[in-house]
Amino acid sequence: MNAAVLFSGGKDSALAAVLLSRDYEVELITFHFRPGQESGEVTAAAEALGFPHRTCVFGPGLLSRAADMVIACGFPNDAINMVHLSAVTALAHEYQVVADGTRFNDRVPRLPRAEVQRLWNRYGCSYLRPLLGYPKAEVDRLVTRFLVVSQGETGSIGNGDYEREIRAEVRAKGHDTGTFFPGHHEQSLVIRKR
């Protein structure tokens, strides 16, 4: 059975894919807000993992709504959760199994139990979070066992994280992203498997 894994190119989604590959035919899926936003680094990360990879584009207007939500709320959490739910829902139309790399202590993205149940009731889709029981320290230990990654500040690494494009849209709307997004947020990019 195929499992679509939402893939940013980072260590969490990569580790989720590796763990799921024991039981599923993993396909890595990266979402962007506009056509042509594909990242060569994310494609290279997918190739290094050895899983099929494709990119999808969100419907029009979602990026602007997400940026407006960040500005209105004063923080990105609700916007990132909205975008993540949009990605999972889009894939639920195609796949019986959709997964991501959310961990035990992640605040975002985090889908509430009611949304997960709705995905099953409406689409017959299982939403898997293979890292949900793992705290960050344990994820990092497993990553060092299975993957080689580079790390850096948000925006300095060419990954497929939603936040990068949302930050750019907030800036395009004339706002300082430092007002809304936490400083010193480190992200990762897979270089190769061990």
What are these regions (language model features)?
Residues 1-5, 9-194:
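Nucleotide-activated chemistry modules centered on ATP-dependent adenylation/adenylyltransferase
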